[in-house]
Amino acid sequence: MKKFLKLTLAVALMACSSSVFAQKFGRVDLAAIIPNMSEYKEASANLESYAKDLQDQLEAIQVEFNNKLAEYEKTAGTISDSVKQLKESELQQLQQRYRDFSTIAQQDLSNKENELMTPVFELANEAVKKIAQAGGYLIVFNTANAAASGIAYFDEAALTDVTAEVKRELNVVDAQ
């Protein structure tokens, strides 16, 4: 009985150890894929257009402020103190409006970037997942941001590069 127990334990240990060694690990360079995706290019163009609209609005406030400031400086010597105070108050309000709009525009731009880019990154991650599952990979490392993810070192040569497979899955062609 003891021999049977030892034999069973030995077989179980060998089965466990062989399954550990049979695991496949891959790597992918998403930085080489995502910028070439048509979805990324479209999202980037939309984000750039949105940023330009916000910048145009900000510049319009700046132009309005500059015009009112020039008018104030031109007439400052000829207007009453009460009108001066009114114009100064108006200028301060415009400055505050500029600062407020600038802050809101930065937040809006960040939100818009998340809104536009999140689906692109999700699409890329889904393609990696599909390739990993089809290829039997336990883990696929993104070499583009390995250090940022807390991985101090890994031997890239020991990992199977699945970048080309992910590109094919996403119909990505490298930019020329």
Regions found by a protein language model. Give the residues of each.
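Amphipathic, charged alpha-helical segments and their helix-to-coil junctions
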Residues: 23-176
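Bacterial N-terminal signal peptides that target proteins for export
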Residues: 1-8
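Bacterial N-terminal signal peptides
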Residues: 8-16
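Sec/Tat signal peptide C-region and signal peptidase I cleavage site
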Residues: 16-22
